[in-house]
């Protein structure tokens, strides 16, 4: 993404049902802050196979009780919204939901064909990319849906980073959505010694959708908005002015732009076409069920990353996949009010944290008072 100095703008909001769960850590933490038709889901399953290492979300039970069925889920960002995780709608194929929400005009040119062939010739790469994206895609789809945006945008991290939240470009763009440092700061993505929120799954997704909403409001065209996301809004504005001054069309296909930007929307169109009909390209997509992969667990005390992994029974590399923003081995609760954990590990973490007898952090940050004499 080209470095910009944007201002956020709210997207369109609409009602939805959502399926995330907030776990309340008694005495150790404070509270933080729909689906496609079954027919479409059944039709889509003929082109998918089970994901490797991506299990269906288990029920999360309160530590003090073991009822026969799990309680309704609670969204950590919208705690008044609940959904029955046992309902049929909660298990609808997420790919069907993505397909049903696609609304951008199609590109149909040789560049699209070129990228279709590239992906079709690399089934192992597509498999790895979709398995990685399985951790994050439900949350992104929920946010795109909530804002009433075209569902093609949920596929954009495939193009930006292959759904790798640790990705860093040669130009220093970072995270799943590839924010440049200055652009990230303008969207309040903190970048300091302890964390880089350009890699934060929740914060970077919110910032990216804010930015894309602003760009669409500026250009009135999703292809131009995407070009601006990649190349920079100022560059797109100047390219439009040049074409208009020369009496030429000012649509995406008619503008003069760098090769990377020229290929940007065709790449997204190729991924869209593959998601719509993977069998046509000799590909098979993994099954993605329409429910969350992770849960947000609130914390109020500093805690070591290694201790979180230990208490959650989660390998450190898996913790880092959901919480890639941390730069140091300690998590400062003042700047990080919640952690992301898979459902079953979140429940384990809550129980073990309540029983943990020792300190949570082996070291922490300390601000030197201005009046302290270092030589004293």
Language model regions located:
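Extracellular LysM carbohydrate-binding repeats and other cell-envelope/extracellular binding modules
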Residues: 322-356
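Extracytoplasmic/secreted proteins, especially bacterial periplasmic and envelope-associated proteins
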Residues: 110, 114, 128, 132-135, ...
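Bacterial N-terminal signal peptides that target proteins for export
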Residues: 3-17
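Short, functionally critical alpha-helical segments immediately adjacent to catalytic or ligand/cofactor-binding
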Residues: 149-166, 225-231, 320-323
């Amino acid at each position: 993404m080209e470095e910009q100095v944007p201002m956020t703008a709210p997207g369109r909001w609409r009602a939805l049902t959502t399926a995330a769960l907030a776990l309340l850590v008694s005495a150790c933490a404070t509270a933080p802050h729909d689906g496609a038709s079954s027919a479409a889901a059944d039709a889509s399953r003929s082109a998918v196979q089970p994901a490797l290492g991506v299990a269906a979300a288990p029920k999360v039970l309160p530590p003090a009780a073991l009822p026969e069925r799990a309680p309704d889920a609670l969204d950590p960002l919208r705690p008044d919204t609940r959904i029955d995780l046992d309902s049929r709608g909660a298990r609808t194929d997420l790919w069907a939901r993505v397909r049903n929400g696609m609304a951008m005009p199609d590109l149909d040119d040789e560049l699209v064909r070129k990228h279709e062939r590239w992906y079709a010739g690399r089934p192992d790469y597509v498999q790895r990319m979709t398995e990685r994206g399985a951790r994050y895609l439900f949350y992104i789809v929920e946010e795109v849906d909530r804002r009433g945006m075209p569902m093609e945008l949920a596929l954009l991290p495939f193009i930006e980073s292959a759904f790798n939240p640790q990705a860093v470009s040669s130009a220093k763009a970072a995270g799943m959505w590839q924010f440049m440092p200055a652009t990230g700061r303008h969207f309040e993505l903190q970048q300091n010694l302890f964390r880089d929120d350009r890699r934060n799954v929740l914060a970077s997704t919110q910032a990216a959708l804010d930015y894309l909403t602003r760009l669409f409001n500026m250009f009135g065209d999703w292809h131009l908005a995407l070009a601006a996301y990649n190349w920079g809004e100022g560059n797109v504005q100047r390219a439009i002015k040049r074409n208009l001054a020369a009496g030429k069309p000012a649509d995406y296909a008619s503008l003069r732009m760098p090769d990377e930007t020229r290929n940007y929307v065709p790449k997204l169109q190729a991924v869209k076409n593959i998601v719509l009909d993977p069998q046509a390209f000799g590909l098979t997509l993994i099954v993605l069920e329409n429910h969350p992969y992770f849960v947000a667990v609130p914390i109020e005390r500093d805690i070591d990353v290694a201790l979180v992994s230990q208490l959650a029974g989660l390998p450190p590399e898996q913790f880092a996949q959901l919480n890639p923003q941390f730069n140091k081995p300690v998590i400062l609760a003042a700047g990080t009010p919640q952690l992301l954990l898979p459902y079953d590990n979140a429940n384990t973490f809550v129980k073990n944290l309540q029983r943990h007898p020792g300190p949570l952090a082996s070291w922490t940050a300390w601000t030197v008072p201005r009046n302290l004499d270092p030589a004293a």
